[in-house]
A protein has these predicted regions:
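Adenylate-forming
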Residues: 1-83, 90-92, 97-102, 127-128, ...
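AMP-dependent adenylate-forming
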Residues: 55-58, 73-216
Length: 216
C-alpha cells in the first residue's frame, strides 16, 4: 500500500530483504525498478524479481570503495549465476592471481578495486590499512584487496564466485566465522565449537553452532 500511496518507483534492498518483500505481497511491487546488492543474488530470486516487470539492477561493492563499484542490468536471465556487471564511472576493477598478475577471461581470481571511490583506509588501523590497500601494480593509486573471488565472462561482465576466506554475509552484514567460534568456546561447559553456514533455497544464511550433541 505504501508503495502506491507514495508513488515509489525505485527500491534498493539486499536479496534477503527482497525475498521477504515478495513473500509478503509481490503484487505490490509490480512495475517498481528493483535494485539489489549487499549479498550474492540467487538466480531463483532474480527470476521472481524479474516478474515484477522491470529489469533488475544488480550492484556490487564493499564499504571500503564507498559501496557500489560495479553494476549490471539483468534483463534476460540465463545461466546459473547473475553477473555483477562492469565497473561504474571512475572505478577500476581487476581480477588478479596470487602473483598480482592479470587473469584471462574465465579464470578465477581475487577482485581488486581502485578509483575515485576508494576509502583512505581504516580508522586507527594502520596495520589493516596496509594489508588491504595496496599499490596498484597495473596503474596509478591504490587498490582495495576485497577478498572476493570473481572471473571475467566473455561478454565483459564480472561473475561473483564467493570468498577466499571464512567471511560470510548475513542480510548484508559481514560476519567472521572465527569470531563466532571464539565466543562460543568461552561459554561454560563448551570444549569445541564449529560454525556452519547453511544455504536454503533463498540463499538465506542460517547460522548454527554445534556443541557436543546439541545445536543452538
Amino acid at each position: 500500500a505504501l508503495v502506491n500511496e507514495q508513488a515509489i518507483t525505485h527500491i534498493q534492498a539486499t536479496p534477503s530483504h527482497w525475498q521477504a518483500l515478495l513473500e509478503d505481497n509481490a503484487e505490490a511491487f509490480t512495475g517498481v525498478q528493483p535494485l539489489v546488492g549487499g549479498e550474492a543474488l540467487p538466480m531463483e530470486l532474480a527470476r521472481k524479481m524479474r516478474k515484477l516487470g522491470a529489469p533488475i539492477i544488480n550492484l556490487y561493492g564493499p564499504t571500503e570503495t564507498t559501496i557500489w563499484s560495479t553494476m549490471m542490468t539483468l534483463d534476460k536471465l540465463e545461466g546459473g549465476t547473475p553477473a555483477i556487471g562492469r565497473p561504474i564511472w571512475n572505478t577500476q576493477v581487476y581480477v588478479l592471481g596470487d602473483d598480482l598478475q592479470l587473469l584471462p577471461n574465465g579464470a578465477a581470481g581475487e577482485l581488486y578495486i581502485g578509483g575515485e571511490g576508494l576509502a583512505l583506509g581504516y580508522h586507527k588501523r594502520p596495520d589493516l590499512t596496509a594489508e588491504r590497500f595496496i599499490a596498484n601494480p597495473h596503474g596509478e593509486g591504490l587498490l582495495y584487496k576485497t577478498g572476493d573471488l570473481a572471473r571475467w565472462r566473455d561478454d565483459g561482465a564480472l561473475e561473483y564466485l564467493g570468498r577466499n576466506d571464512l567471511q560470510i554475509k548475513i542480510r548484508g552484514f559481514r560476519v567472521e566465522t572465527e569470531e563466532i567460534e571464539s565466543q562460543l568456546i568461552r561459554c561454560r561447559g563448551v570444549r569445541r565449537a564449529a560454525e556452519l553456514s547453511l544455504s536454503n533455497l533463498t540463499d538465506e544464511r542460517m547460522q548454527r553452532a554445534k556443541m557436543g550433541q546439541w545445536w543452538v
